[in-house]
Amino acid sequence: MSKLLVLFVVSAMALLQFSMVEATPQKFHVNGRYGK
């Protein structure tokens, strides 16, 4: 049961991070362009 809960939390956090990256693509593009 606890393993299932941990898996759910990890997948939810991964989805949240992915949606945040998708919501702000320009910031990451600028960082990639000027970071080199």
From Swiss-Prot:
Residues annotated with Tyrosine amide modification: 34
Tissue specificity of this protein: Expressed by the venom secretory cell of the spine. The spine is a cuticular structure containing a single large nucleated venom-secreting cell at its base. It is an independent unit capable of producing, storing and injecting venom. On the back of D.vulnerans caterpillars, spines are grouped together by 50 to 100 to form scoli, of which there are eight in D.vulnerans.
GO cellular component: extracellular region
UniProt modified residues of type Pyrrolidone carboxylic acid: 26
Keyword tags: Amidation, Pyrrolidone carboxylic acid, Secreted, Signal, Toxin
MF terms in GO: toxin activity
Annotated localization: Secreted
Signal peptide residues on this chain, from the entry's feature table: 1-25
Similarity field: Belongs to the limacoditoxin-1 (ACP-like) family.
Function statement: Probable toxin. Does not show activity on the ACP receptor (ACPR) from the mosquito A.aegypti, on receptors of the closely related neuropeptides adipokinetic hormone and corazonin. In vivo, does not reveal any observable effects when injected into crickets (A.domesticus). Does not induce increase in intracellular calcium in mouse DRG neurons, suggesting that it does not induce pain.
Protein's UniProt name: U-limacoditoxin(1)-Dv5
Organism: Doratifera vulnerans
